[in-house]
Amino acid sequence: MSAATDEILEKLKTLTLLEAAELVKQIEEAFGVSAAAPAGGMVMMAPGAGAAAPAEEVEEKTAFDVVLDDVPADKKIAVLKIVRELTGLGLKEAKEVVESTPKPIKEGISKEDAEAAKKQLEDAGGKVSIK
């Protein structure tokens, strides 16, 4: 690949899921294309191939979202500190996240990072799920 395409690829890797979805919409509008899979795509598959596909998709999941589901009132300050540490948000933004649960804290991260973030938030008193 050329240096220009390598640079674009590296920038794409840093996007959050929300930013990537927004980019897809903008590309669809700008170029008049659709990112949706063709409707007849499943018909062309060999019999039996369709049964294996869902299992492969589950195994291939490499990006996880850490969602803060609930924060007890007496644990808000401790959880707020961890949210700021994990996200780099300012005090006001982190407070809004903690007070508007359920809310994603980190998106599109590795399983190890998601588990570490979950442990930190749970140790501080928050209820967390990984999706």
UniProtKB/Swiss-Prot annotation:
GO terms for cellular component: cytosolic large ribosomal subunit. Residues 100-131 are annotated as: Disordered. One of its GO terms (biological process) is translation. Residues 100-125 have a biased composition (Basic and acidic residues). It comes from the Bacteria. GO terms for molecular function: mRNA binding; structural constituent of ribosome. Keywords: Ribonucleoprotein, Ribosomal protein. Forms part of the ribosomal stalk which helps the ribosome interact with GTP-bound translation factors. Is thus essential for accurate translation. Homodimer. Part of the ribosomal stalk of the 50S ribosomal subunit. Forms a multimeric L10(L12)X complex, where L10 forms an elongated spine to which 2 to 4 L12 dimers bind in a sequential fashion. Binds GTP-bound translation factors. Belongs to the bacterial ribosomal protein bL12 family. This is Large ribosomal subunit protein bL12. It comes from Cyanothece sp. (strain PCC 7425 / ATCC 29141). The lineage of its organism: Bacteria, Bacillati, Cyanobacteriota, Cyanophyceae, Gomontiellales.
